[in-house]
Curated annotation (Swiss-Prot):
HAMAP family: RNase_P (MF_00227). Its EC number is 3.1.26.5. This is Ribonuclease P protein component. RNaseP catalyzes the removal of the 5'-leader sequence from pre-tRNA to produce the mature 5'-terminus. It can also cleave other RNA substrates such as 4.5S RNA. The protein component plays an auxiliary but essential role in vivo by binding to the 5'-leader sequence and broadening the substrate specificity of the ribozyme. Keywords: Endonuclease, Hydrolase, Nuclease, RNA-binding, tRNA processing. InterPro entries: Ribosomal_Su5_D2-typ_SF (IPR020568), Ribsml_uS5_D2-typ_fold_subgr (IPR014721), RNase_P (IPR000100), RNase_P_CS (IPR020539).
Amino acid sequence: MVKLNFSRELRLLTPIQFKNVFEQPFRASTPEITILARKNNLEHPRLGLTVAKKHLKRAHERNRIKRLVRESFRLSQHRLPAYDFVFVAKNGIGKLDNNTFAQILEKLWQRHIRLAQKS
């Protein structure tokens, strides 16, 4: 049976792990979202989240975005390549409703799957 959890081993936790992704990433982006990725030496993908106060002033808005990204990653993790992903929120992200946001995330995950197959 496939596990659809988001355990500690599926998260980027330390600044060094984030820095590693920021060095030479594959990018997939829209005006509101960028997802950076870099191959890891593990057998599973990992996710890191960055949602700045600059783009979303209120904590409940930042939490909503992070919750939606975690859920999307959790459901897509078995299709994703063994990469470290960093989600970066940009201006205008707060104006997206949940359905539109989920559709955009799905397109970005698909783009990363295609990029991984090419490399």
